[in-house]
């Protein structure tokens, strides 16, 4: 092959590589720009825009009540979005045209922190505005879902609704046997005897049990207040 042909192929290859890289960069920049544009557009669509007249706000609690996992409006993951729901209730509180909340619950429960925070926000709504909440329990309104439901002045349920489960659970895995079998040794250096709980001592089990008991008692008190019952009556039903 002649030198001129070789040089021509090398130049053509270089041009192809540069063009390809430029194309990738251009596509990436275009995609990022488009994502930013769509994010801005959707953020505007998600702004609180209530009706001009009196209305009832619908608060959907669907899915596991837990920390918000949606990091962007472009995230299409479904399920309960905690921060969004809390902000929405705040907006309803501040709007004088809002006359109440229809609370739609379809949740098997969730984390203690988010469940109680949602409950407290709904109670704050009622106490601040004096407006009612009507609860409808769909497929599930169990555990944290039930904690949320009892904020309703009126509670309605389908005949097939699964509800109740007034309790608290804390769980984990003891993998020490597996580690020993695989020859894996776990080492930790701590500042206190209870800092490391990889191998639970009786004292640590007692500490965790006291936390569970405290959360359970708070759950019982919430249900008792919401259902106009005594704590003993609730515990008798909870089992």
Spans of features found by a protein language model:
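Glycine-rich beta-to-alpha transition loops that act as phosphate-gripper elements at the mouths
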Residues: 134-142, 237-239
């Amino acid at each position: 092959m002649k030198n001129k042909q070789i040089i021509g192929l090398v130049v053509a290859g270089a041009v192809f590589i540069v063009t390809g890289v430029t194309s990738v960069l251009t596509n990436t920049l275009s995609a990022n720009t488009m994502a930013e544009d769509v994010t801005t557009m959707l953020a505007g669509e998600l702004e609180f825009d209530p009706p001009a007249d009196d209305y009832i706000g619908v608060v959907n609690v669907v899915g596991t009540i837990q920390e918000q996992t949606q990091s962007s409006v472009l995230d299409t993951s479904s399920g309960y979005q905690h921060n969004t729901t809390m902000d929405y209730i705040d907006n309803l509180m501040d709007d004088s045209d809002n006359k109440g909340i229809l609370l739609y619950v379809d949740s098997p429960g969730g984390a203690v922190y988010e469940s109680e925070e949602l409950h407290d926000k709904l109670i704050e709504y009622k106490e601040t505005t004096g407006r009612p909440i009507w609860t409808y329990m769909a497929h599930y309104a169990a555990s944290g879902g039930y904690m949320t439901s009892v904020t309703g002045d009126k509670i309605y349920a389908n005949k097939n609704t699964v509800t109740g489960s007034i309790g608290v659970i804390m769980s984990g895995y003891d993998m020490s046997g597996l580690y020993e079998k695989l020859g894996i040794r776990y080492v930790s250096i701590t500042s206190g005897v209870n800092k490391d709980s990889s191998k639970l001592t009786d004292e640590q089990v007692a500490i965790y049990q006291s936390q569970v008991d405290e959360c359970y008692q708070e759950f019982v008190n919430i249900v008792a207040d919401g259902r106009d019952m005594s704590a003993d009556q609730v515990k008798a039903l909870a089992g």
